[in-house]
Design a protein with these regions (language model features):
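Gly/serine-rich nucleotide phosphate-binding loop at the start of the catalytic core
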Residues: 1-110, 114-117, 121-134, 208
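Acidic/glycine-enriched connector segments
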Residues: 307-496, 536, 545-550, 560
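Glycine-rich anion-binding loop/nest that anchors nucleotide
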Residues: 37-42, 120, 177-240, 351-355, ...
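Glycine-rich, charge-decorated loop segments at or immediately adjacent to ligand/cofactor-binding or catalytic sites
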Residues: 238-253, 261-262, 359-365, 446-463, ...
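TIR-domain catalytic/interaction hotspot
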Residues: 28, 179-193, 362-364, 368, ...
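SIR2/sirtuin-family catalytic core signature
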Residues: 2-37, 62, 103, 108, ...
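C-terminal interaction surface of TIR/SEFIR-family domains
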Residues: 279-295, 465-515, 520-529, 607-659
Length: 659
């Protein structure tokens, strides 16, 4: 790597370091219940809905206007010429479709956020909040503001209206110009919230007219020196946006790409002046990784305590009390639980519990004794311990509570356990839920009962960490609790590393998608080599699709091919002896052509294949037929030094007139 490449890669790493810093700041604000979300059109794209540009595409075609023009003006021109109903029909028809699963919205709904704002007309956010067991109040016009109901877990402000009432949707230039007159309460409330809360803006492009309006509001509202810090996910200007339908980029579009990149840099600097920090992403899909990072950073300090004893015999802690020890009127088990609650809070962990009999009350006592709460105990129930009692609840309700609590935790400590039977014990249910969530599990064997049995189950499968094994040799309660705290701290360090690594590895995940079609038995080694060369280089603009696991079911294989080719613009065809006769290669070529992909055929000219001029001529003829007469330039893997030139071949395929 030359010095210019090193400088460029260092710059990319610096951007990610800054992104991580912003995400960590957001996490701290979430812990204080200080974050609201503002969702733009990009959020709903993954649900199968179109963005603003594509929503108005039919109108642009009808009016013979450039789709890259001012979209709200275009909507106004249509209304002036044809009336409003056509616009209403577009909104109603587009959002009548059933949405696809949307991972970004799922993570947003999981986050501990109570207020969501959006300029979108669809119901993607409210539906996902309901899936996450969060009741949501929808405010789609300012008249509904007077009906605020505190029983709801979330509020969604739909500033531009709702798909069910397209007549009232904000869409045209006139709608924007009269917004403050017709919907003044929305504007005033948002202005207050921009001062009171930290906002996370998501789904906006750098030239989004809605972002322009919010910036204008921020500039007029946030004129003090100490601005509230806000954050905005923004997709980098990408070269893929400037390819034509043949996947070729002209010199004019290269010039536009350079100008837009500069404009985006200036926009980011301008936003920073008004307290809005930009989290730059390569692709909206990369936001998924960052939202997951936010959620896991929020939950990393959350510990679920699972355990209880027989409510009819609240003095029976089994063999744990065989060692006689009393202090302040507490037996050994009660001392242990109290000390555990105290030290967890002292070390910055938050406790979640179903308040099991003989366990929850002593954990709470420990929280009250924590040094953190020495001045006041007013807010500790909300901030340091989250209790949802299972006592008296029916079984279905119990399981729902357990799942909700455990999903919000990164670790689980299992102590005692009323029943040794898996069928009867809620402890086993909580243990299984924790396994499904991928939680770090600490069964304290010394406490006996279900905790000991779960320890033995995990130990049998070598799933007990060294930190947890060391608890068995603890001599006293202080040592045992210190060991638990240290195990949690080590888990936190390891999780932090994994989360950071995932973010850094995502830098090179997005670019112009490349699909490799080949005969697996003959050419999988070369296909793997190409994938590694292209994906390893963070500086190129390509990403090769990887098949993580070999599939056998023909329906599954074809479905995977369909899904992956949709994400790509280039198909590399590796040609060896029987490649063009293979069923799946033919299918992949067919789908690639239908998707408009550029085809790059590469002949694997090894001694084993022994391609003479006659064979090459036959291959070219077959390929010509499969590509419906379209001419392509054949490359030779060995003769043309493919290892060195593969990225050059990809670059050449984008140049105007190359194909």
């Amino acid at each position: 790597m030359n010095y210019k490449q090193q400088i460029e890669e260092d710059k990319m790493n610096q951007i990610m370091e800054r992104n991580i810093e912003y995400l960590n700041q957001l996490t701290e604000q979430m812990k204080s219940d200080q974050v609201s979300v503002f969702a733009g059109a990009g959020v709903s794209v993954a649900s199968g809905y179109v963005d603003w540009k594509n929503l108005l595409k039919p109108i642009c075609k009808l009016l013979r206007l450039d789709i890259n023009g001012n979209l709200i003006e275009i909507a106004q021109y249509y209304k002036n010429q044809y009336n409003r109903q056509g616009l209403n029909d577009i909104i109603f028809n587009e959002f009548a479709k059933l949405p696809k699963n949307n991972k970004n919205v799922m993570w947003l709904a999981k986050l501990p956020i109570k207020e969501y704002w959006t300029t979108n007309y669809d119901d993607v956010i409210e539906k996902e909040l309901e899936k996450q067991d969060k009741s949501v109040q929808i405010i789609k016009n300012q008249e509904l503001l007077k009906y605020h109901n505190p029983k709801y877990k979330a509020i969604l402000y739909k500033m531009h209206g709702d798909k069910e009432d397209p007549d009232d949707a904000v869409l045209t230039k006139e709608d924007y110009e009269t917004y403050d007159e017709k919907r003044p309460l929305f504007t005033k409330l948002l202005a207050v919230e921009l001062v009171r809360k930290t906002f996370l803006f998501i789904g906006f492009s750098f030239n989004d007219p809605n972002l322009e309006r919010i910036l204008s509001l921020a500039k007029s509202s946030l004129n003090s020196k100490n601005l509230r810090r806000h954050y905005c996910f923004m997709r980098k200007v990408q070269i893929t946006d400037y390819l034509n339908s043949d996947n070729i980029i002209s010199s004019q579009m290269v010039d536009k790409y350079v100008k837009d990149t500069k404009y985006q840099e200036l926009r980011i600097a301008d936003m920073e002046n008004y307290g809005i920090s930009t989290i730059l992403v390569d692709d909206f899909n990369q936001i998924t990784i960052m939202l997951e990072y936010l959620y896991k950073k929020y939950t990393i300090d959350n510990v679920f305590i699972s355990g209880g004893i027989n409510p009819k015999d609240l003095s029976n802690y089994g063999r744990f009390n065989n060692v006689h020890s009393t202090k302040d009127g507490l037996n050994r088990a009660e001392q242990f639980l109290t000390l555990l609650g105290e030290k967890l809070v002292d070390n910055g962990f938050q406790i979640y519990t179903g308040f099991g009999a003989g366990v929850g009350n002593y954990i709470l006592s420990g929280v009250l004794e924590s040094k953190k709460n020495i001045l006041t105990n007013t807010d500790i129930i909300n901030n340091d311990i989250h209790i949802s009692s299972l006592l008296g609840a029916e079984e279905q309700r119990k399981n729902k509570i357990r799942r909700r609590l455990i999903e919000q935790c990164s670790s689980i400590i299992i102590v005692f356990g009323y029943s040794n039977s898996e069928n009867e014990s809620g402890i086993y249910c909580e243990y299984e839920l924790a396994q499904k969530c991928g939680d770090f599990i600490i069964p304290v064997k010394e406490t006996g009962f279900a905790a000991e049995q779960i320890y033995n189950l995990l130990n049998k499968d070598n799933k007990i960490s060294e930190d947890v094994q060391h608890l068995n040799s603890a001599c006293d309660l202080d040592e045992m609790v210190s060991g638990i705290i240290q195990a949690l701290k080590n888990h936190k360090i390891n999780e932090d590393k994994k989360l950071r690594q995932r973010l850094f590895s995502s830098i090179s995940m997005y670019g112009i998608g490349v699909f490799i079609s080949y005969h697996y038995n003959n050419d999988h080694v070369i296909a793997k080599e190409i994938t590694q060369i292209v994906n390893k280089d963070k500086l190129n603009i390509y990403t090769v699709v990887k098949e993580n696991k070999k599939k056998k079911d023909p329906k599954v294989i074809r479905s995977w091919i369909d899904e992956q080719i949709k994400k790509t613009k280039i198909t590399i065809l590796l040609i060896s002896g029987q490649t063009l006769t293979r069923e799946y290669v033919s299918y992949e070529l067919e789908k690639s052509i239908a998707n408009g992909n550029t085809i790059i055929p590469i002949l694997i000219d090894s001694k084993l294949n022994n391609f003479n001029s006659r064979k090459v001529k036959l291959i070219n003829k077959k390929l010509h037929e499969k590509l419906s007469g379209k001419n392509t330039k054949m490359r030779y893997w060995y003769r043309d030094n493919g290892v060195v030139n593969i990225t050059n071949w990809l670059d050449e395929s984008l140049e105007e007139g190359e194909i």
